[in-house]
Every structure is written in structure tokens, then in C-alpha cells.
């Protein structure tokens, strides 16, 4: 088999066989296929697309390129949730203990944040003593005993994806549905999930800016999952403004705790119940989404979900007293109010700009080496569609420095007030095929 023949075949719009895709992925992983041929094939895929069989083959070739996490010793159906990323996306912190409280095993592998999106692990490390560097054996035992545990990402999962991702970044082939879908799904499958729930974001703070693109990606990932024996569902949710009210590590953890107590922001609570219902159904703990939703609402009302979160924290060395006393979490020295300059309705809060402002305060990393300031960030007091009066506080900046003119300038350009406005739709679609 020759790489040039595979490139020409795809260039001419023909379908590649499973063997041809495996030949490319194995060759590229082991440096037998040079970058220039790999980028040529990526560009051919970008223009000619791939059918469902090709996408499934590409995904599984990337899964098989490295180590795989074996979670077969965990009882029950392991359901993983993946979000395509956003700003203030606190869902995992609420979802994991919530679905665990109704019997869904959550074996979560999480990363750290880079850029304007915070990683789940950064948020959890706001809790004194919390440790994600646990052995696979301990991880499995924790999930069997308590239904939920979080571990840091392992080094050698999907090396083919890492190489291809870096190449796409510099060759103009990032925005290709088959390449994005296989990249995301290969990581989830290699991490041992039996079933997968996807939260595909759309809007200004999302990778997929338009609803059509988000829908195409959601369908692609759901089909890949179902074609390789992993039950998969997706929802398309709004990320034109930040999710919930808090952006920043300890601030988001406080918000997660109040959501588990039943006092969280409306949008975060709704998204968690929608995603959680799918996880409960895929884990076969309920037969319908309505039944699953009611189970989750009850787990919040009775305090079961909150207790599960406490146990989860203490199991991994964390100080669980922060659940009852969130003021023990890291906090910033100063709180600066950002006030409305006129009366009207908020029509826009640009999600990624708010994320960047939060990163500039120290809540995110610009490079992998950066140390995060866990206490800083931004808390929204108003959301899109809400009325404000001149001089009313729109958001509060939690900062450890008084030198924030550049941040105030950025916020000024990220929030729009007009004479009328309405709240965006939170959940656009549910995709099951």
C-alpha cells in the first residue's frame, strides 16, 4: 500500500477502506508517513468529507494507536459526558455527583484548562488537599464504592490524535467535521466509556459558531459512537453568553455547591438536568428522560446529591467542610463592581471575551507553565435579556490587583445594552442519531 495512492483516492472524492485508514494512522504515529503527506490527506478530507464508515474507522484507528483505559472492573454502564468547551462551564462539577447519587457510575478523566476555558481539575484543586493523581486501582475502587471519582489525564492515550491535531492547527484543516468528530470521540472511547453524552456548544463562546455547524458535528459524533458500539446522545446548547454566573475556579466551585443545594442559576440547573437525564437513561437507571429528570430533581431536594459531593471530595483528600462553609475557598482581595452606563436590556455578553478577561485576572493559563490564581474571576449579576438601570451592577470583578483598566476596557466592549432584548434559547436540540 502506498500513501500517495490513498491521498489521490480521497482527493478524487472516493471512500477509503478501513485498511487504508489504518495504514495512514499507524504510519503517521510511527513517523513512517511524513507531515507533508499527512497534511495533504487532511486537506483532501477537508474538501471531500468522509462517510460514516470512514469516520468510524478513523476514530478506532486513533483509539488503537496508544493505551486504552480498561474500566471493565467497574460495575454498571460507564457513561461519560463531553462538552465541546465554553466559558463558565461548571456542568461537570454538578453533574458528576448528581448522577452518581442516582446510581450512575462516573469514572471521569479530566484535564487542566488552557486559554479562556478552565479545566475541571483546576476548579477541583480550589479545594484544599484534593488529589487527582491516584492509581488506576484506587480510581476503580472509588467508583465502585461511591459511584464517582476524577483522575488526571493519562499520558499515552490516542497519540495519533495528538499528532494529527497539532498538524491540523498549522495547515488550515481544523474546521473539518470528520476530523473534529473523530478526534473528540477517539479520546472518549480510549478513556473507557461504554456510553457517551455530548454537549455541543454553539454561539460566540463556542468552537461551532452556527447552529448548522453544531448540528453537523453532533450528528457526526453520535453516529460514530453508535457505529462502534457506544450508545451516544448529544444536545446542542447555547454558548453565546457564559453559562451560569461565575467564571473562575473557586467562584465556579461555589456556584456548583449552590446548584447542588437547589439554589443554582437557572441556565446551569436546566443544562445539568437535561444532560443528566440522558446519562441516567444510557446507564439504564431509568427508562425515560422524564423519569430520569425526576430522579435527579429528587436527589437535589433530599440532599443526596450534596452528600455525594462531600464524600467525593473527602475520598480524594479534599476538605469537605467547604460544602457547608464555601467562604473557606480561596477568594480575591478586591471586588470591583462593573456598572451599567445606561438603562435598557442586555442584548449581548460575549462569552469568550468574558473568558479572556477572567484569564487576564489570573483565572486561566496563557501557557501550560502558568500558575492559576484560584480565587479570582468574574461573577455576572445580570444575563442577556434582563433589564438594567444606569448605575446598576452588571457584574463583579474578583481581583488581587487594583490595576485592571485593560480588563474594564475589555468588559466595556463585551457587553451591549439596547432598548429591547430577549434571553437566548439554552437548549437548541437533542440529537440521538
Curated annotation (Swiss-Prot):
InterPro entries in the record: Glycosyl_Trfase_fam3, Glycosyl_Trfase_fam3_N_dom, Glycosyl_Trfase_fam3_N_dom_sf, Nuc_phospho_transferase, PYNP-like_C_sf, PYNP_C, Pyrmidine_PPas_bac/euk, Pyrmidine_PPase_CS
Binding positions for phosphate per the UniProt entry: 81-83, 92, 108-110, 120
Annotated substrate binding sites: 168, 187
Key words of the record: Glycosyltransferase, Metal-binding, Potassium, Transferase
Gene3D superfamilies reported in the protein's UniProt record: Nucleoside phosphorylase/phosphoribosyltransferase catalytic domain (3.40.1030.10), Pyrimidine nucleoside phosphorylase-like, C-terminal domain (3.90.1170.30), Transferase, Pyrimidine Nucleoside Phosphorylase, Chain C (1.20.970.10)
Catalytic activity, EC: 2.4.2.2
Pfam families: Glycos_trans_3N, Glycos_transf_3, PYNP_C
The UniProt record lists the keyword Glycosyltransferase: yes
Quaternary structure (record): Homodimer.
UniProt similarity note: Belongs to the thymidine/pyrimidine-nucleoside phosphorylase family.
Protein name as annotated: Pyrimidine-nucleoside phosphorylase
UniProt organism field: Staphylococcus epidermidis (strain ATCC 12228 / FDA PCI 1200)
Origin organism lineage: Bacteria, Bacillati, Bacillota, Bacilli, Bacillales
Gene: pdp
Amino acid at each position: 500500500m502506498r500513501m500517495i495512492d490513498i491521498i489521490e483516492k480521497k482527493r478524487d472524492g472516493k471512500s477509503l477502506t478501513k485498511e487504508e485508514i489504518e495504514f495512514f494512522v499507524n504510519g503517521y504515529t510511527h513517523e513512517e508517513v511524513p507531515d507533508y503527506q499527512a497534511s495533504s490527506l487532511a486537506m483532501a478530507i477537508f474538501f471531500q468529507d468522509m462517510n460514516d464508515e470512514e469516520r468510524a474507522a478513523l476514530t478506532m484507528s486513533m483509539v488503537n494507536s496508544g493505551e486504552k483505559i480498561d474500566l471493565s472492573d467497574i460495575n454498571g454502564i460507564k457513561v461519560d459526558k463531553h462538552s465541546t468547551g465554553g466559558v463558565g462551564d461548571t456542568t461537570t462539577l454538578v453533574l458528576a455527583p448528581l448522577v452518581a447519587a442516582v446510581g450512575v457510575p462516573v469514572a471521569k478523566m479530566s484535564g487542566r484548562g488552557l486559554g479562556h476555558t478552565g479545566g475541571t481539575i483546576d476548579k477541583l484543586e480550589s479545594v484544599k488537599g484534593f488529589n487527582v493523581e491516584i492509581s488506576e486501582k484506587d480510581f476503580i475502587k472509588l467508583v465502585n464504592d461511591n459511584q464517582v471519582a476524577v483522575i488526571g489525564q493519562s499520558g499515552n492515550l490516542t497519540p495519533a490524535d495528538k499528532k494529527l491535531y497539532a498538524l491540523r492547527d498549522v495547515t488550515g484543516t481544523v474546521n473539518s467535521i470528520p476530523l473534529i468528530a473523530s478526534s473528540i470521540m477517539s479520546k472518549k472511547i480510549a478513556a473507557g466509556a461504554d456510553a457517551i453524552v455530548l454537549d455541543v456548544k454553539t454561539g460566540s463562546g463556542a468552537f461551532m459558531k452556527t447552529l448548522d455547524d453544531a448540528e453537523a458535528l453532533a450528528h457526526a459524533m453520535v453516529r460514530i459512537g453508535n457505529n462502534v458500539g457506544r450508545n451516544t446522545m448529544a444536545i446542542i446548547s447555547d454558548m453565546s453568553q457564559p453559562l451560569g454566573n461565575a467564571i473562575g475556579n473557586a467562584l465556579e466551585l461555589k456556584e456548583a455547591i449552590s446548584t447542588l443545594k437547589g439554589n443554582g442559576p437557572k441556565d446551569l440547573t436546566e443544562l445539568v438536568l437535561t444532560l443528566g437525564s440522558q446519562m441516567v437513561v444510557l446507564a439504564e437507571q431509568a427508562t425515560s428522560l422524564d423519569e430520569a429528570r425526576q430522579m435527579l430533581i429528587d436527589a437535589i431536594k433530599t440532599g443526596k446529591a450534596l452528600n455525594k459531593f462531600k464524600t467525593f471530595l473527602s475520598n480524594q483528600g479534599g476538605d469537605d467542610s467547604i460544602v457547608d462553609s464555601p467562604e473557606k475557598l480561596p477568594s480575591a482581595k478586591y471586588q470591583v463592581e462593573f456598572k451599567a452606563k445606561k438603562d435598557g436590556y442586555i442584548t449581548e455578553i460575549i462569552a469568550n471575551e468574558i473568558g479572556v478577561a477572567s484569564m487576564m485576572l489570573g483565572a486561566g493559563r496563557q501557557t501550560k507553565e502558568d500558575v492559576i490564581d484560584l480565587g479570582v474571576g468574574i461573577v455576572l449579576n445580570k444575563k442577556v435579556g434582563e433589564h438594567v438601570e444606569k448605575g446598576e451592577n452588571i457584574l463583579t470583578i474578583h481581583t488581587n490587583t487594583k490595576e485592571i483598566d485593560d480588563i474594564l476596557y475589555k468588559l466595556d466592549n463585551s457587553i451591549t445594552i439596547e432598548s429591547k432584548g430577549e434571553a437566548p434559547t439554552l437548549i437548541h436540540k437533542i440529537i440521538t442519531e
